[in-house]
């Protein structure tokens, strides 16, 4: 393999690697946006759960149900 063939091969590999890096970067950006949306949803759900938490708690002072 002469020098020109080696250079051509390296240029081809470099172009392929550049394309792969760009594709991976696009995927990473998409996943990061999805993670950020999920974090916002989780925060909203936790806040909602805290707000609703007092509605379903039973008091220890309540009398037992009639079938006791």
Swiss-Prot record:
<dbReference type="InterPro" id="IPR007236">
    <property type="entry name" value="SlyX"/>
</dbReference>
<dbReference type="Pfam" id="PF04102">
    <property type="entry name" value="SlyX"/>
</dbReference>
<protein>
    <recommendedName>
        <fullName>Protein SlyX homolog</fullName>
    </recommendedName>
</protein>
<comment type="similarity">
    <text>Belongs to the SlyX family.</text>
</comment>
